[in-house]
Amino acid sequence: MSKAEREMYKKVRRIMVSDLKRDLIGPAHDESDVIYEAPSQAYITGILYPLESEVETEKSLEDVQFADVYDEPESGMEEDVEQQRNSELEQEAEEEKITPNKKFKHQNSLGIRCYVRETTDHIRASIAWGRYTSSKKFDSERKREVILWTRQIECFEEYISLSSFDQNIDIPITQEVSLVVSKKKLSGTDVFLVSVFLVNKRVDKNSNNAMFQCELTLTHEEGKGIFLCENEARKDKNDFSEFLYRNKPVFAKGFGCAVTWKAESSNYASELKSAFIPEHEVESMSTDLPYDENYGELPKGYFSIKQFAEADDQRETIDKLNNLANRYESWINKLPVDKVANKEATERVIKDCQATLTRIRRGIQLLANEENNKAFVAFKFMNTVMHTQDAMKRYSRNNKTTTLETEIRKENLEWRPFQLAFILLNLEGLVDLKSKDRKIVDLLWFPTGGGKTEAYLGICAFLLGYRRLFASTSSAYERDGGVTILLRYTLRLLTTQQRDRLMRMISACEYTRQKTNAFGQSEFSVGFWVGAQVTVNKLDDLTENEYYLDRDKVLKEYEKIEKQVIECPCCGTKGLEYKFLPSRDTKTKKTGIKIFCTNESCFFSKTHIPVYLVDEEIYRKLPTVVISTVDKFARLPWDEKTAALFGKVNRFCERCGYIAEGEKHEKSHRNPKASVHDVKPFYPPELIIQDELHLITGPLGTVYGGYETVIEELSTAHEGEDYLKPKYIAATATIKNAEVQVEKVFGRKLTQQFPPPGLKVEDSFFARERNLDEFPFRLYAGVCVSGHSMKTVLLRIYAVLLQTTEHLLEDEELSKYIDPYRTLVGYFNSIRELGGAVRLLEDDIKKRIQTLQKKYKYSKQRYISRKPELTSRVPSSRIPKVLEQLEKEIGNEELDVVLATNMISVGMDVDRLGLMVITGQPKQTSEYIQSSSRVGRSKPGLVITVYNPYRPRDMSHYQNFKGYHQRLYHFVEGTTATPYASRARDRFLHAIAVALLRLSYPELAKNLDAKNIKDMDLNYLKDVVKKRVSTVEYRNVSDTMEHLQHFLDEWISRAVSEDNLQYYFNPKTRSARIGNQSRLLARFSEEKKHGGKPTLDSMRQVEGTSSLYIYEGWNSSEE
């Protein structure tokens, strides 16, 4: 995009903000204003009302919050609705209580809080506001007399002498308006905390006599920078994060308003100004390398993926990679450490950067090894795959006029330096199974939309190729096949979109394998391991039976599966062919599902698309990469087949596939028979990737940290006396205290963030802030209106933004730049609040748009017709359709409005979106960053945050709007998880004990083998748990081991006394009702009369719920 185009998008955005301010506040002071409606109705913010002015509530206090009970979810809802609801209800429950006033109180004052040195004598206060007077006029159009309101601007200037009072002073401006000033000296400093208030003291119940478009500006009479930054004024705030953000100072905060400023330096500002709709634009990050005088400008295409893939000269590739490392080293050496006062922080920065450089160089050395060039061959394979998947992406856009082979011959893609560096620093940990680097959890921390996914997909491609090159060298394990990588997410929307990216990469792997006849005999494939509400868990669920599956239900399951992969990852063709093997007949027992492209010229019309969607097939086919939501691992204690995911197989059936150790297998297959032969176990998963790490926190992180004990142990290879654990990689755009969280959840003491920060947050070498004048990015604006309900505020904002884009379509020049702002994304913290907006869209917003058309004489009105939701109420099968609709540009049935909850805060990558309205400050800053980052990814974005003035937390963020937004990542809250705490152990300790034993020992695998526990040596289990707890929380070791022993004793006791003990049976089956069965485990949702320890079947059920019954007719006088 050219600079001229960026300026045009910026111009459209500026018009939208200006229109919003005009409608909510009124015109600027240098414009005239004559209106036909009362000013108190025309404008809703920027107003200081007379003291006794009030308005009645429009409905009730609940109306402020949209406190309507949301509808029940539709049938067929997926299992993660519970987690989504829990999150949304938790948001509602934890919000600050709103003062239960019977009336909305109007604001009658505003203020600015700032810091000045003791030597500052005067502050100049400039005050201005609009005063409206009414008059009558005959309207020839309406043929009647109308009332006109005309504005007059009142301006005053007052010099505040700080030495003339001790603590407080009241300075009259007029008979009805005054300045109230207070000052307080900070202990042990020469700094005063000064607060200046503008107060409307008029007593009048007529709100039209208010002060409109109020402004308060503080300066020095000589224009000096006298306002001290908070970090300098309050020395107690000097932590490492403050050090990094020292060039983004906070100079003031507001009272009842926000504050903007003009800064002379990083320590002093020369002007502070009140703002009722404050704005702040955040910078985008450039991944281009800085110019280096020793190495010059990096040529375009220098890190060409195609050139790396085709390189025959190993030395040439190594030279390019060394050039990257040399530039980084040069940058580190030139950091101006002598000019930075905080030496402790400086030493930390240099140490972290040097450690990263050392690991990058070790990765390059591995690739430079000419005697053992397998790493270099795998590196070329990685580049071939990444180039091919990009060619597939381009082929998908226009498969009518080009071919995949044609696109492969083109050179379009190159590595971003940070992506290549991250791959290089991870190579040793992937190649050398005994390397110390394998113990490090590498955290890829990069802003949303920066290319994190491509970086770790490159690592995946390298490992897949490298593992196959060593397929014949292992005696204990088979490496040609088996699950190599576990890729985990938390939310289903994220998993759906990332699955599609991964599927294209894996398709490129398989395309390359088949074209080169190298890299093993087993296919490269991906398994989508998610809940039963997304796809069936068993193939039997695709066949009619006499109990509960009739033809209609089976056909619905067919339809659900067919909605998962919508288009071919290679050519983009839609309407794929799903082959239900051996036939589509609903009465035929299914043996598998294969998906083919219907485009005859596509590679995957001859061979199936390498993806598996049904749990049973995943256990049998063992796809190379398994992508799942984290909660799916709660299935481990329930199903012995899950052992196969960790390579624990010992048989192969020609019809079914791989069979887990200890698993019961039917030999007959009814007819004809299939042969079964013994096989070596596969090497367990070598890499575990956790995307959006910041979401693994709180109750979910606590429980998941317990299950991670099992996952890491089952992914550990035992070769002789060596215990070779898997490599962990995590990625996030928002996290704080990552080292603590990684230790609690993953049990790893070492965490390394990449890229490590430099001496300032603006520049880490691999990522540098861009200049806003040249690269406009994402503009935030805040609205906080007292005296009106949130309903009123929201409908006014939505109406203005929607109508403005319609009006601008008539501008021949600007109409080409409307598309990013044509679809409004409405973000809500709960379904309850969203429900109120749904009703507004149906009626009130439409009426307000009509009003705007008449008021501002627009020639056309915006009509709202396409307005879907993205919430937990939407079934997974419908989500891809909504995402597809979001991609549609203006004039192509584009969506008008999309209402969403925190489901979209990660993973919704739609580049065209540029407009969002966030209702209420999200509970966490990380969620605020993630959600607002859904817009403005490719074009300058606009985010309007609507604050609730009756929530103290919202007001706090609004009053510190500029300070908060200019250092957003600084305010990210630390994440927490407490595995092995007492209550957490109640939830999962018995489950991980069952999972470890059942999946490690064939004698305990089958459902009826639960009774065999009495014959087992349990020291292995105890050692694993003890080591884990010692790492995670040493203080809980004794209690945990006692807790574990209690459960094992109970299990053994039952195994001795109950011959029919099994892990689980469904109490609703006929055999369970008439038989004498006993079970070890029970689902949380089941009745407890059948016994069994309540056990999680999904991590969506982490927190319990209670039912509340209200009996009508109860009379307290009867007590």
Swiss-Prot record:
Is ATP-binding found in the keyword set?
yes
Per its UniProt record, what InterPro entries does this chain match? Helicase_C-like (IPR001650), P-loop_NTPase (IPR027417)
- Helicase C-terminal domain spans which residues? 813-986
Q: Mention one GO molecular function.
A: ATP binding
Q: Where in the cell is it found?
A: Cytoplasm
User: Where does the source fall among the domains of life?
Assistant: Bacteria
- UniProtKB keywords: Antiviral defense, ATP-binding, Cytoplasm, Helicase, Hydrolase, Nucleotide-binding, Restriction system
One cellular-component annotation, GO:
cytoplasm
One matching Pfam family is Helicase_C
Query: What do mutants without this gene show?
Result: When this gene is missing the DISARM system does not confer Nf, phi3T or SPO1 resistance in B.subtilis.
Free-text function comment from the UniProt entry:
Component of antiviral defense system DISARM (defense island system associated with restriction-modification), composed of DrmE, DrmA, DrmB, DrmC and DrmMII. DISARM is probably a multi-gene restriction module, this subunit is probably a helicase. Expression of DISARM in B.subtilis (strain BEST7003) confers resistance to phages Nf, phi29, phi105, phi3T, SPO1, SPR and SPP1. Protection is over 10(7)-fold against phi3T, 10(4)-10(5)-fold against Nf, phi29, phi105 and SPR, 100-fold against SPO1 and 10-fold against SPP1.
Mind telling me what this protein is named? DISARM protein DrmA
Organism source for this protein?
Bacillus paralicheniformis (strain ATCC 9945a / NCIMB 11709 / CD-2)
